[in-house]
């Protein structure tokens, strides 16, 4: 069973905001005029980065109004991206205090504090009222939550009838054991990776109707190949996911890249409709 305290400890970093500011300065970004795009190398913490978020945006375009829920929002990068593109208000919830604290500061920094509001808490037991949101999504979150049926029950409770729930997670392909550490877990006890079929089964078990489910393996492989080539040419950028991953960033990224390239892991996209 994945312990939420261990998950929080895996991500918590009290110096993160200062590190992001230093990275922006190193890139000659004016801290008084920071754009959402300037933050995407560090706050779009998932395979594909901003391009990965666009898969979610394409599905959320079908929702013409209302407020969205970001389940496991992290620093709020996808929330700010989605809010800007679709002009929606977004609530986010995440376990990690520093992600929420600094995520709200980053929203203020880019002028999105009135549109994106992040709170600290468990996605399994949120403080929101039932039938509150017009859509929900989660981006690379389920790998840390083994109680997926309980999670999907809670999301269903929060959604208005017939609302969409979009999932973009790292998923298992086949039965090959995962090599750790990876970006979401230092070891197996922190990880809850499952395959696409199980995600769909759990969603349908609690009453969702799955309208789309697909693995985005080729997209992820292209992204990884481009990332590796760019790093060979440019070296490590001042602002990037290494700020979130700490001293073991290289091996975490190498392990997940290798496993996606060999086909044992892939990002999966699911669109489900609440009852």
Feature locations, PLM:
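Class I SAM-dependent methyltransferase SAM/SAH-binding core
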Residues: 67-125
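Conserved alpha-helix/loop element of class I SAM-dependent methyltransferases that forms part
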Residues: 29-32, 46-66
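N-terminal auxiliary segments of SAM/dcSAM-dependent transferases
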Residues: 1-25
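A short SAM/SAH-binding and catalytic strip from SAM-dependent methyltransferases
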Residues: 134-147
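Short, glycine-/aromatic-enriched active-site segment of Class I SAM-dependent methyltransferases
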Residues: 170-190
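A short glycine-rich, Lys/Arg-flanked "PGG" loop and its adjoining helix->strand segment in the class I
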Residues: 149-164
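A short acidic, Gly/Pro-enriched loop at the edge of an enzyme's catalytic core
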Residues: 124-135
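Conserved Class I S-adenosyl-L-methionine
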Residues: 212-275
């Amino acid at each position: 069973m994945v312990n939420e305290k261990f998950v929080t400890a895996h991500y918590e970093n009290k110096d993160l905001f200062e590190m992001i500011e230093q990275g922006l300065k190193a890139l000659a970004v004016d801290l008084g005029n920071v754009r959402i795009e300037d933050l995407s190398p560090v706050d779009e913490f998932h395979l594909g980065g901003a391009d990965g978020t666009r898969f979610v945006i394409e599905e959320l375009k079908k929702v013409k109004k209302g407020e969205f829920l970001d389940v496991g929002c992290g620093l709020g990068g996808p929330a700010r991206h989605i809010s800007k593109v679709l002009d929606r208000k977004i609530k986010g919830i995440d376990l990690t205090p520093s992600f929420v604290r600094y995520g709200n500061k980053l929203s203020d920094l880019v002028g999105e504090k009135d549109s994106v509001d992040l709170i600290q808490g468990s996605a399994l037991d949120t403080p929101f009222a039932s039938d509150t949101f017009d859509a929900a999504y989660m981006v690379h979150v389920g790998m840390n939550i083994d109680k997926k049926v309980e999670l999907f029950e809670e999301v269903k409770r929060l959604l208005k009838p017939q609302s969409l729930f979009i999932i973009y997670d790292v998923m298992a392909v086949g039965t090959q054991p995962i090599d750790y550490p990876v970006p979401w877990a230092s070891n197996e006890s922190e990880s809850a990776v499952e395959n696409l079929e199980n995600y769909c089964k759990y969603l349908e078990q609690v009453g969702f109707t799955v309208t789309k489910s697909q693995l985005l393996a080729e997209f992820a492989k292209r992204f990884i190949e481009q990332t590796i080539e760019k790093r060979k040419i440019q070296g490590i950028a001042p602002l990037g996911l290494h700020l979130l991953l700490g001293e073991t960033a290289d091996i975490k990224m190498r392990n997940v890249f290798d496993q996606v390239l060999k086909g044992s892991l892939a990002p999966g996209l699911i669109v489900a409709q609440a009852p």
